[in-house]
Protein backbone atom coordinates (compact mmCIF):
# COMPACT_ATOMS: atom_id res chain seq x y z
CA UNK A 1 0.00 0.00 0.00
CA UNK A 2 1.40 3.41 -0.95
CA UNK A 3 1.91 6.14 1.61
CA UNK A 4 -0.42 9.10 0.82
CA UNK A 5 2.10 11.57 2.34
CA UNK A 6 4.92 10.59 -0.05
CA UNK A 7 4.89 12.12 -3.51
CA UNK A 8 5.32 10.05 -6.64
CA UNK A 9 8.98 11.07 -7.00
CA UNK A 10 9.83 10.53 -3.32
CA UNK A 11 10.95 7.35 -1.63
CA UNK A 12 10.67 6.58 2.07
CA UNK A 13 13.92 7.07 4.01
CA UNK A 14 15.82 3.90 4.63
CA UNK A 15 16.48 2.69 8.17
CA UNK A 16 20.12 3.81 7.83
CA UNK A 17 19.11 7.31 6.71
CA UNK A 18 16.67 7.62 9.60
CA UNK A 19 19.41 6.57 12.02
CA UNK A 20 21.81 9.18 10.63
CA UNK A 21 19.14 11.88 10.90
CA UNK A 22 18.47 10.91 14.52
CA UNK A 23 22.17 11.03 15.37
CA UNK A 24 22.59 14.46 13.80
CA UNK A 25 19.65 15.77 15.81
CA UNK A 26 21.11 14.28 18.99
CA UNK A 27 24.55 15.82 18.39
CA UNK A 28 23.01 19.21 17.59
CA UNK A 29 20.91 19.10 20.75
CA UNK A 30 23.89 18.07 22.88
CA UNK A 31 26.02 20.88 21.45
CA UNK A 32 23.29 23.43 22.15
CA UNK A 33 22.94 22.20 25.73
CA UNK A 34 26.71 22.36 26.25
CA UNK A 35 26.77 25.92 24.91
CA UNK A 36 24.11 26.96 27.42
CA UNK A 37 25.92 25.23 30.27
CA UNK A 38 29.32 26.72 29.44
CA UNK A 39 28.23 30.24 28.53
CA UNK A 40 30.03 32.48 31.08
CA UNK A 41 27.71 34.26 33.48
CA UNK A 42 28.02 38.04 33.39
CA UNK A 43 28.21 39.46 36.90
CA UNK A 44 25.72 42.17 37.78
CA UNK A 45 27.39 45.55 38.06
CA UNK A 46 26.51 49.20 38.49
CA UNK A 47 28.22 52.15 36.84
CA UNK A 48 29.30 55.62 37.89
CA UNK A 49 31.58 57.99 35.97
CA UNK A 50 32.31 55.20 33.51
CA UNK A 51 33.55 52.88 36.27
CA UNK A 52 31.83 49.50 36.59
CA UNK A 53 31.41 48.17 40.13
CA UNK A 54 30.37 44.56 40.76
CA UNK A 55 27.32 44.10 42.99
CA UNK A 56 28.78 41.07 44.77
CA UNK A 57 32.39 40.05 45.33
CA UNK A 58 34.36 37.44 47.25
CA UNK A 59 37.25 38.63 49.43
CA UNK A 60 39.30 36.48 51.80
CA UNK A 61 36.86 33.65 51.19
CA UNK A 62 33.83 35.73 52.23
CA UNK A 63 30.98 37.01 50.09
CA UNK A 64 30.35 40.74 50.26
CA UNK A 65 27.51 42.79 48.78
CA UNK A 66 27.75 46.29 47.40
CA UNK A 67 26.21 48.65 49.93
CA UNK A 68 26.58 51.76 47.80
CA UNK A 69 28.81 53.90 45.59
CA UNK A 70 29.68 57.58 45.48
CA UNK A 71 31.87 60.10 43.73
CA UNK A 72 34.61 61.58 45.90
CA UNK A 73 35.88 65.01 44.95
CA UNK A 74 38.88 67.12 45.87
CA UNK A 75 37.94 70.71 45.24
CA UNK A 76 36.75 70.86 41.65
CA UNK A 77 38.43 67.57 40.73
CA UNK A 78 36.88 64.12 40.66
CA UNK A 79 39.23 61.97 42.74
CA UNK A 80 37.69 58.50 42.71
CA UNK A 81 34.56 56.41 42.61
CA UNK A 82 34.24 54.94 46.09
CA UNK A 83 32.43 51.67 46.79
CA UNK A 84 31.45 50.23 50.16
CA UNK A 85 31.14 46.44 50.47
CA UNK A 86 29.63 44.75 53.54
CA UNK A 87 28.44 41.27 54.58
CA UNK A 88 24.89 42.73 54.67
CA UNK A 89 23.47 46.01 53.46
CA UNK A 90 23.11 48.81 56.02
CA UNK A 91 21.68 52.32 55.63
CA UNK A 92 23.15 54.20 58.61
CA UNK A 93 26.71 54.88 59.66
CA UNK A 94 25.98 53.54 63.14
CA UNK A 95 24.77 50.21 61.73
CA UNK A 96 27.84 49.91 59.51
CA UNK A 97 30.15 50.53 62.48
CA UNK A 98 28.43 47.86 64.57
CA UNK A 99 28.48 45.26 61.80
CA UNK A 100 30.72 42.28 62.47
CA UNK A 101 32.90 40.74 59.82
CA UNK A 102 34.78 41.84 56.75
CA UNK A 103 34.29 45.34 55.36
CA UNK A 104 35.80 46.94 52.28
CA UNK A 105 36.24 50.48 51.03
CA UNK A 106 37.24 50.37 47.36
CA UNK A 107 38.72 53.39 45.60
CA UNK A 108 38.52 53.44 41.80
CA UNK A 109 40.95 56.21 40.92
CA UNK A 110 39.92 58.90 38.42
CA UNK A 111 43.05 61.11 38.39
CA UNK A 112 46.72 60.95 39.26
CA UNK A 113 48.00 61.54 42.80
CA UNK A 114 51.51 61.19 44.19
CA UNK A 115 52.14 59.28 47.42
CA UNK A 116 52.99 62.50 49.26
CA UNK A 117 49.66 64.03 48.23
CA UNK A 118 47.79 60.89 49.28
CA UNK A 119 49.48 60.86 52.70
CA UNK A 120 48.80 64.56 53.25
CA UNK A 121 45.12 64.20 52.33
CA UNK A 122 44.72 61.11 54.51
CA UNK A 123 46.23 62.73 57.61
CA UNK A 124 44.13 65.89 57.17
CA UNK A 125 40.91 63.90 56.74
CA UNK A 126 41.72 61.50 59.58
CA UNK A 127 42.42 64.37 61.95
CA UNK A 128 39.17 66.06 60.98
CA UNK A 129 36.96 63.09 61.88
CA UNK A 130 38.90 61.77 64.91
CA UNK A 131 38.69 63.30 68.36
CA UNK A 132 41.88 64.84 69.78
CA UNK A 133 42.19 61.90 72.18
CA UNK A 134 41.73 59.34 69.39
CA UNK A 135 44.29 61.06 67.20
CA UNK A 136 46.88 61.07 70.00
CA UNK A 137 46.21 57.40 70.88
CA UNK A 138 46.57 56.35 67.26
CA UNK A 139 49.61 58.41 66.30
CA UNK A 140 51.75 55.27 65.82
CA UNK A 141 49.04 53.62 63.72
CA UNK A 142 48.77 56.76 61.60
CA UNK A 143 52.52 56.50 61.03
CA UNK A 144 52.09 52.88 59.86
CA UNK A 145 49.36 53.91 57.44
CA UNK A 146 51.56 56.70 56.14
CA UNK A 147 54.36 54.18 55.57
CA UNK A 148 51.96 51.95 53.63
CA UNK A 149 50.97 54.86 51.40
CA UNK A 150 54.66 55.61 50.84
CA UNK A 151 54.97 52.22 49.11
CA UNK A 152 52.78 53.61 46.34
CA UNK A 153 54.76 56.14 44.32
CA UNK A 154 51.62 57.38 42.61
CA UNK A 155 48.12 56.31 41.64
CA UNK A 156 46.67 56.96 38.20
CA UNK A 157 43.28 56.77 36.51
CA UNK A 158 42.05 53.17 36.41
CA UNK A 159 43.95 52.05 39.52
CA UNK A 160 42.04 50.21 42.24
CA UNK A 161 42.85 50.56 45.94
CA UNK A 162 41.12 48.22 48.40
CA UNK A 163 41.10 49.04 52.11
CA UNK A 164 39.70 46.14 54.10
CA UNK A 165 39.01 45.30 57.70
CA UNK A 166 39.59 41.56 58.10
CA UNK A 167 38.76 40.17 61.57
CA UNK A 168 41.77 38.42 63.06
CA UNK A 169 44.15 39.94 60.51
CA UNK A 170 43.51 43.66 60.76
CA UNK A 171 43.61 46.43 58.21
CA UNK A 172 44.53 45.03 54.80
CA UNK A 173 45.35 47.42 51.96
CA UNK A 174 46.13 46.60 48.33
CA UNK A 175 46.95 48.68 45.27
CA UNK A 176 46.08 46.93 41.99
CA UNK A 177 46.28 43.63 43.88
CA UNK A 178 49.68 44.37 45.48
CA UNK A 179 49.58 44.12 49.26
CA UNK A 180 50.63 47.27 51.10
CA UNK A 181 50.10 46.16 54.71
CA UNK A 182 51.18 43.11 56.70
CA UNK A 183 48.95 40.46 58.25
CA UNK A 184 51.27 39.02 60.89
CA UNK A 185 51.54 40.47 64.40
CA UNK A 186 55.34 40.71 64.20
CA UNK A 187 55.20 42.46 60.82
CA UNK A 188 55.91 46.20 61.23
CA UNK A 189 53.38 46.84 58.46
CA UNK A 190 50.58 44.99 60.29
CA UNK A 191 47.78 47.36 61.38
CA UNK A 192 45.47 45.44 63.69
CA UNK A 193 43.49 48.33 65.16
CA UNK A 194 39.75 48.36 64.50
CA UNK A 195 39.27 51.85 65.96
CA UNK A 196 41.57 53.24 63.28
CA UNK A 197 39.50 51.55 60.57
CA UNK A 198 36.25 52.84 62.05
CA UNK A 199 37.65 56.36 62.04
CA UNK A 200 38.64 55.78 58.42
CA UNK A 201 35.03 54.81 57.67
CA UNK A 202 33.87 58.08 59.24
CA UNK A 203 35.76 59.90 56.47
CA UNK A 204 33.26 58.42 54.01
CA UNK A 205 30.00 57.87 55.90
CA UNK A 206 30.36 60.04 59.01
CA UNK A 207 28.81 63.49 59.61
CA UNK A 208 31.84 65.31 58.15
CA UNK A 209 31.64 63.44 54.83
CA UNK A 210 29.99 65.22 51.88
CA UNK A 211 26.27 64.38 51.95
CA UNK A 212 26.22 63.13 48.35
CA UNK A 213 29.11 60.72 48.99
CA UNK A 214 27.74 59.56 52.35
CA UNK A 215 24.23 58.93 51.03
CA UNK A 216 25.58 57.07 48.03
CA UNK A 217 27.72 54.72 50.13
CA UNK A 218 24.85 54.09 52.54
CA UNK A 219 22.66 52.95 49.66
CA UNK A 220 20.29 55.89 49.93
CA UNK A 221 20.59 56.95 46.29
CA UNK A 222 19.72 55.07 43.12
CA UNK A 223 22.50 53.19 41.31
CA UNK A 224 22.49 52.65 37.55
CA UNK A 225 23.06 49.08 36.37
CA UNK A 226 25.34 48.29 33.46
CA UNK A 227 23.12 47.40 30.51
CA UNK A 228 20.07 49.21 31.88
CA UNK A 229 17.95 49.24 34.98
CA UNK A 230 18.62 50.58 38.44
CA UNK A 231 19.27 49.47 41.98
CA UNK A 232 16.79 51.40 44.07
CA UNK A 233 17.55 52.80 47.54
CA UNK A 234 16.86 50.62 50.53
CA UNK A 235 13.36 51.31 51.99
Regions found by a protein language model. Give the residues of each.
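Cysteine/selenocysteine-centered motifs that mediate thiol-based redox chemistry or coordinate metal-sulfur cofactors
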Residues: 212-235
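Mid-length scaffold segments of soluble, non-membrane domains
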Residues: 90, 95-162, 166
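Short strand-turn-strand beta-turns centered on an Asx-Gly dipeptide
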Residues: 175-177
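N-terminal secretory signal peptides
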Residues: 1-21, 30-36, 45-97
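Flexible glycine-rich active-site/ligand-binding loops centered on an Asp-His dyad
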Residues: 183-211
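Soluble periplasmic/extracytoplasmic beta-strand elements of cell-envelope proteins
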Residues: 65, 83-85, 104-108, 172
